[in-house]
Design a protein with these regions (language model features):
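A short acidic (Asp/Glu
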Residues: 74-80, 99-104
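Short, basic/hydrophobic alpha-helical segments
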Residues: 40-64
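An anionic, glycine-rich sequence signature occurring as long contiguous blocks
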Residues: 6-34, 38, 90-197
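Short, conserved catalytic/metal-binding motifs centered on acidic residues
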Residues: 1-3, 66-72, 89, 174, ...
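Short, well-ordered secondary-structure "scaffold" segments embedded in the functional core
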Residues: 66, 71-77, 182-184
Length: 217
């Protein structure tokens, strides 16, 4: 699991954690033979991500937004932890992610998308890629939360939806937590587009130092 930092001037990996499945952590002899410390316990990928984010934030790494794919966005504990630190995020979730919309009743992300009128969609670029601008149709709708204090109400919860322009009309879904003053559609689209930075980093690391062949050890 890798943590990638993306800024205006570029991006770089700044931390990593080795994911070990339970078939490994539950087999002490296997771990001993591989040189894995006895104290190593099983941790999910979102839990490893939290450890890295906590290290980065606690050491003062400037962080405007956190973004990641469905593996991390689908973990509510990670999302709630980020909220507890008032750390804005745009995290991908699955189409069947249950969300509070228009009240304290769960609605699937794809059902929310189906309910939005045509005027809710706007064509925007999620940054330029190798083949030009990454154009998609995007919709943004607020999610419901019980917010009592003025401090809680400073932040909003939203569902950002991306729809492809081809015949497949494929959708992607993002749960957003952000200050209401910063939650413009274009800003959130830009953050969602930053997730490609980690894929760019992987390709560069594979070509330059054989990351896919573990030549960096």
């Amino acid at each position: 699991v890798f943590l990638c930092y993306a800024g205006h001037e570029g991006s770089a990996f700044i931390d990593r954690e080795l994911y070990l499945p339970q078939s490994w952590t539950g087999d002490p002899q296997r771990c001993k033979a591989a040189g894995i410390p006895d104290i190593t316990k099983f941790a999910t990928k979102p839990q490893l991500a939290k450890q890295m984010l906590e290290r980065a934030l606690d050491t003062g790494v400037p962080c405007g937004w956190v973004t990641g794919d469905e593996v991390y966005g689908g973990d509510r504990h990670l999302r709630l932890w980020l909220e507890s630190r008032e750390q804005p995020f745009v995290l991908a979730v699955a189409k069947n992610e249950p969300l509070w919309w228009q009240g304290p009743t769960c609605v699937r992300a794809d059902r929310i998308a189906e309910s939005l009128p045509a005027r809710a969609w706007r064509r925007l670029s999620a940054r330029a890629g190798a083949k030009g601008e990454r154009l998609y149709d995007w919709a943004l709708t607020p999610l419901w939360r019980l917010q009592i204090t003025a401090e809680e109400r400073r932040f909003g919860h939203y569902l950002l939806i991306r729809r492809s322009l081809d015949e497949k009309r494929e959708h992607a879904y993002y749960v957003v937590y952000a200050p209401r003053t910063k939650a413009s559609r274009q800003t959130l689209v830009n953050v969602a587009g930053r997730r490609w930075e980690i894929e760019i980093g992987f390709e560069a690391a594979k070509g330059e130092c054989g990351l896919d062949q573990y030549e960096v050890r």
